[in-house]
Every structure is written in structure tokens, then in C-alpha cells.
Regions:
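Short, conserved, GDST-rich strand-edge loop motifs in beta-rich repeat architectures
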Residues: 123-144, 264-274, 278
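Loop/turn-rich, solvent-exposed surfaces of beta-rich toroidal or solenoidal domains
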Residues: 239-286
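Asp-box/WD-like beta-propeller blade repeats and closely related beta-sheet repeat scaffolds
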Residues: 62-66, 70-136
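Beta-propeller blade signature
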Residues: 70, 137-156, 273-286
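Blade-loop segments of beta-propeller domains
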Residues: 28-62, 78-88
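Beta-strand-rich domains and repeat architectures in extracellular enzymes and scaffolds
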Residues: 1-17, 249-252, 258-265
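Structural signature of eukaryotic scaffold interfaces centered on beta-propeller domains
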Residues: 1-4, 47-51, 100-117, 178-187, ...
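Beta-propeller fold detector
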Residues: 29-35, 75-92, 160-167, 211-227, ...
Length: 287
């Protein structure tokens, strides 16, 4: 994954657990970190994001978290604390969408972004045999009550809150299971998020529960998704569906020009992907 830090381009090499930096012309400058347990090493890298006070935050694929200073020295290291008060037996006996213990990091399409001074956001999922979007008595609850984002304390690594229900389109249609991942970005207290099958972009601010929305459907997208009735069938066709059909891919906020960029795939019928540009919540370009 690429990211911008000051006037440099950063790239996280997951294989080597290293961060490579380049100048704005693409010329290599230096590398930081490696895999291990030493002072300048991490156990792995799945996601990295720059945060305030010239620090960095890393999440690996085993729920390990690393807070680093500007020289990539470890300030703190901990594991995600899901803050669940129930035992696994209690959770599975009576699963409820608000139970943090039912959730895990959505590693299929993970992302890490700071929100405000003290928090980070990352996507979560809870596809268990007891509550999922495919089958079972709790399927109806999945899209109406399940939450999709976790609010993590930078200081403690504790999940303070789960937020963001699936939008109405996921409750109305039953064929979106392979396109249920979230896309989002933040800037200071502003938080924009959407979902792969939804044309709307939702906006909320830290400390305010009001949610507004904007957005227009992308051009020439094939969204005639297939419906699946079992977890196995959906999983078996996951890669095939994501190659064949169109979906929204990513959101990026450009605060300096008051712009929001959203990329999308049209589907296998088109050799091109799409790019939308919004300014003050209005679409000004769609390429």
C-alpha cells in the first residue's frame, strides 16, 4: 500500500515487513523497519497509516498493533482489545450484532485511518455460522443491524465502539454478499464511507451522530450480481464475481482542494475503470 508522508511517498512491503520511501519523482530514498522482535522491527505489516505528531501506526495480520515515532522506533506495542464482556460460549449461544466479541478485522479489504486526535478506524466483519449474510435464522439481522467499522483507541488498543450499519440497498437486495466491503477515508474529524455496491457516499463527524449522504452512480457498471444462499457457494464464486461485475473500489479525500475521489470497476465487459471527482458533495467529473 502507498501513502503520503510530508513530501515523500511511502510504500509498505508486506513480504519484508519494511517501509520504503521515495521522493515525488519516484526515486528511492530509504527503507525503514524489518521483520522481527527487535527495537526497529515489527512482527508484520498489513496496514500502516501516518498519524498526528509525526507518528505511525501499524496493524499486522495477527491483531498486533505498533505505535512508532518519526524515526520508526516503537513507542508502544499491543494487541487489539475487542473489549468484549461475554465468554465465547455466551456469544455463540445468543449472538447479538452489537457484541464486539463476534467481530474480527476485515482483512479481505483492510484499511487504517486516524479519526480525530485519539482514534483510528478499521473495517470489521462477523461472518460466523450463527450470523451472516448468506444463510440461517439471523440472516435478516446481518444487513439491518450488523456494524462494519471499529473505533480503536490509539493509546490503549481497545475497541471503544462499533459504528456504521449497512445501507438500505443491502437490506433490500439479497445478492450483494460478494460486494459487501467498505471503502472510507478521513480528514481530521470528517469521516466519509461507502460500500462496494452502493452509489451513495456517507459523511459523519466525530462526536456527531448525524449522517448525510451524496453520490451518483458510476458509468457503465455491471451490477447484475448473482444471488447465493450458502456461505460455501458465495465463497466459491468470490473471485469470479469480482472479475465479472462492477463495484466501487476506494475513496480518497483531498482536503487542500476540497475534493473527494472515488474509483470504481465497471466489470469485465470494459477495459477501463472509472474515477469520480466530487467537490462540495457535487459530482464535477466522471472519467
Amino acid at each position: 500500500e502507498f501513502f503520503i508522508y510530508n513530501d515523500k511517498i511511502g510504500f509498505s512491503d508486506r513480504t519484508l515487513s519494511s517501509i520504503l520511501f521515495y521522493d515525488n519523482q519516484g526515486h528511492y530514498i530509504t527503507s525503514k523497519l524489518s521483520q522481527g522482535r527487535g527495537p526497529n522491527e515489527v512482527l508484520g505489516i498489513d496496514q500502516i497509516t501516518p498519524i498526528t505528531n509525526n507518528r505511525f501506526f501499524i496493524m499486522d495480520e495477527q491483531w498486533n498493533l505498533f505505535l512508532l515515532d518519526s524515526c520508526f522506533r516503537k513507542i508502544n506495542q499491543y494487541r487489539i482489545n475487542w473489549n468484549s464482556q461475554k465468554s465465547l460460549k455466551q456469544l455463540l449461544k445468543n449472538p447479538q450484532p452489537e457484541d464486539t466479541g463476534l467481530y474480527e478485522v476485515e482483512y479481505t479489504k483492510n484499511r487504517l485511518r486516524q479519526w480525530g486526535e485519539n482514534y483510528l478506524l478499521f473495517p470489521v466483519s462477523s461472518d460466523t455460522k450463527y450470523i451472516n449474510g448468506y444463510e440461517g435464522k439471523n440472516t435478516g439481522l446481518y444487513y439491518s443491524e450488523n456494524l462494519t467499522m471499529a473505533l480503536l483507541s490509539i493509546d490503549s488498543g481497545k475497541v471503544e465502539k462499533l459504528i456504521c450499519n449497512y445501507p438500505l440497498i443491502y437490506q433490500k437486495q439479497k445478492n450483494l454478499v460478494n460486494f459487501k466491503f467498505s471503502l472510507f477515508d478521513t480528514y481530521e474529524k470528517r469521516f466519509l464511507y461507502s460500500y462496494e455496491a452502493d452509489s451513495l457516499i456517507y459523511c459523519m463527524n466525530l462526536g456527531d451522530t448525524t449522517i448525510t449522504s451524496f453520490g451518483i452512480a458510476g458509468k457503465d457498471m455491471n451490477q447484475n450480481y448473482k444471488q447465493y444462499f450458502t456461505l460455501n457457494d458465495a465463497s466459491h464464486n468470490f473471485s469470479k464475481d469480482r472479475n465479472k461485475f462492477g463495484y466501487y473500489h476506494s475513496i480518497v479525500i483531498d482536503p487542500h482542494h476540497d475534493l473527494v475521489f472515488r474509483t470504481y470497476r465497471k466489470g469485465e465487459h470494459s477495459p477501463y475503470d472509472g474515477l469520480q471527482v466530487y467537490q462540495q458533495n457535487c459530482l464535477i467529473a466522471d472519467y
